[in-house]
Amino acid sequence: MELVVQSRETDKKSVIKKIRQQGGIPAVLYSGGKSLANIVVDARVFSKFLSTLESGALASTVFTLSYEGREIKALVKDIQYHVTTYDVIHLDFEELVDGRDVRLNIPIRCINTVDCVGVKLGGSLRQVIRCIRVVCKPKDIVPFLELDVQSLGLSQTLKLSDICIPEGIRPVTSLKEVAVTVARR
């Protein structure tokens, strides 16, 4: 996803309030844990993108930020919403540097749910864990990990270890945890 961002001057409340009134989202770009730049993202463009995004996929979406004539690859590290309107009011981006490890949550997508043996026998498919915490290089980031549930029978489970994890991605969480189960109704 490409975003054109502008620089912003200060962190004063009055300036940030004015940015939001003019249809912008104040944001901070970090690199190596340190603040690199204060920026502004177009609220309409970002909200439109969010509405098309699958649930949980924002954490593994790589953004290309056009900032002061250069392209910066970044991940959204934090997002703040308005309490009542649920509009995005602030973003934190983390710059992706080639060769430097990045920690992120990658969503787990169940495939072949319609053909699942346990569901055909009247069971209910329940996804217990929706994402997995991993460490990888920026070039190895994938939008999601697939878990095939076709052969899953009644009262059976699949663990995180059953996910085919691509080379270059190292899970941080325990792979012994249950990811998906088919429960009797």
From Swiss-Prot:
Q: Which parts form a coiled-coil structure per UniProt?
A: none
Q: Name one Pfam family in it.
A: Ribosomal_TL5_C
Q: Which InterPro entries is this protein grouped with?
A: Rbsml_bL25/Gln-tRNA_synth_N (IPR020056), Ribosomal_bL25/Gln-tRNA_synth (IPR011035), Ribosomal_bL25_b-dom (IPR020057), Ribosomal_bL25_C (IPR037121), Ribosomal_bL25_long (IPR001021), Ribosomal_L25_dom (IPR029751), Ribosomal_uL5_bac-type (IPR020930)
UniProt keyword annotations, A-Z:
Ribonucleoprotein, Ribosomal protein, RNA-binding, rRNA-binding
Which Gene Ontology biological process is one annotated for this entry?
translation
According to the UniProt entry, its GO molecular function terms are:
5S rRNA binding; structural constituent of ribosome
Q: Which family does it belong to?
A: Belongs to the bacterial ribosomal protein bL25 family. CTC subfamily.
Q: How does it assemble?
A: Part of the 50S ribosomal subunit; part of the 5S rRNA/L5/L18/L25 subcomplex. Contacts the 5S rRNA. Binds to the 5S rRNA independently of L5 and L18.
What this protein is called in its record is Large ribosomal subunit protein bL25
